[in-house]
Design a protein with these regions (language model features):
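Long, contiguous binding/interaction regions
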Residues: 1-4, 8-45, 49-189
């Protein structure tokens, strides 16, 4: 079962090491990890994706919450959410194949962010399968891909639901009361 944990952690040295050490101790591989500043100064938002049983997922969530400097944790894999990933893909581009690459970029709704006489860099944001699709097509021409950099998954719940940390800041209280029946039912699953 795939788990997507969203945690708010204090912006302090060693926090990421503690999180990674927990997964090492549990012998669970981290499939994706992103960390960045949140809407609250001094806190970062950590999104972590892993494969584990439902029972192990519950243990992971509880263990994450017990870690020093972890303020809030939620497993939102089953919740209605939006997940995106960013990829930068540098490809070899000659005048002969450049038009073909431009067409491919347009089909995948990506964009060119850097262009030289010998290469170009593609930026693409989307779901993992869409990014994998572009990479697969680019790999059909051996030697075309020079370098790939991917962000990892970023996930946020749909609708008005916000974490308890955001609620404590006074944001989203009224919005939570307006949650639709559909969102409420999805939260109970």
């Amino acid at each position: 079962m795939l788990h997507t944990f969203v945690a708010y952690v204090e912006d302090l040295p060693g926090v990421l090491t503690r999180v990674a050490s927990l997964f090492r101790r549990l012998n669970i591989n981290i499939n994706s990890l992103t960390v960045g500043r949140s809407e609250r100064p001094g806190l970062s938002r950590l999104t972590l994706v892993c494969e584990a049983s439902a029972e192990a997922g519950d243990r992971i969530r509880a263990s994450l919450y017990k870690l020093e400097n972890v303020v809030d944790v939620d497993d939102i894999a089953q919740a209605p959410s939006v997940t995106r990933e960013l990829a930068l893909i540098k490809v070899a581009a000659t005048p002969r194949n450049r038009a073909q690459i431009f067409d491919l970029v347009e089909v995948f709704r990506a964009r060119i962010v850097d262009l030289t006489s010998e290469s170009l860099m593609i930026e693409m944001t989307g779901v993992e399968s869409k990014i994998e699709g572009l990479i697969e097509v680019l790999r059909e021409d051996e030697g075309r891909i020079l370098e790939i950099c991917r962000s990892g998954k970023m996930t946020m719940r749909r609708g008005h639901h916000v974490s308890s940390v955001v609620k404590a800041m006074g944001v989203g209280d009224a919005a939570d009361e307006e949650m639709t029946v559909e969102e409420s039912a999805a939260d109970e699953v």
